[in-house]
Amino acid sequence: PQSGTALDENVKEEIRAFKMDQSKVKVPWMLLEIVQNDDRIDVVKVTKKAGPSDNLETLREELKQREVVYFVLDYEPSEEKRAKHNIPKGKTYPLTCFWSMETANIKLKMKYSSTVGTLKSATSTLKTYLEAHDFDDLSEEAIGDKIKNF
């Protein structure tokens, strides 16, 4: 029997493409969830990608519908933060996040948290990792604290 949860064969390529093509949407993001593949084995798979009209608000709406999920986000600081820290307009910070509501099912939390290492290795080029349990953890201040040189 397989221990842990593997990545779907396309995840690394989809993350690489996400990092390379960040021009199509203002705040691009992707959701990654643990699902069963055709062989009935649990795998981490991209289940939703941001579209042209999506933004941080639509990501929040998606998160409200899920107790536990991973996502990658290309975060762009607000105009105020850019001015304060002399960050050029258009500069973004790709990050990986483990979203786990405080009220989430404990078995589901454990299933996802046991796979964090595998996901981190696949998203290592995104550098910043964030764990969030409520929307305060996804505030600009909280994200800024996690991003180096911010």
Curated annotation (Swiss-Prot):
Domain of life from the UniProt record: Eukaryota
InterPro entries in UniProt: ADF-H, ADF-H/Gelsolin-like_dom_sf
Gene3D superfamilies: Severin
Coiled-coil region(s): none
Domain ADF-H: 3-148
GO molecular function: actin binding
Record-linked PROSITE patterns: ADF_H (PS51263)
Keywords of the record: Actin-binding, Repeat
Family: Belongs to the actin-binding proteins ADF family.
Known role: Depactin interacts with actin at some of its 12 N-terminal residues and 20 C-terminal residues. Binds to actin monomers from filaments and in solution.
Name of the molecule in the record: Depactin
Species for this entry: Asterias amurensis (Northern Pacific seastar)
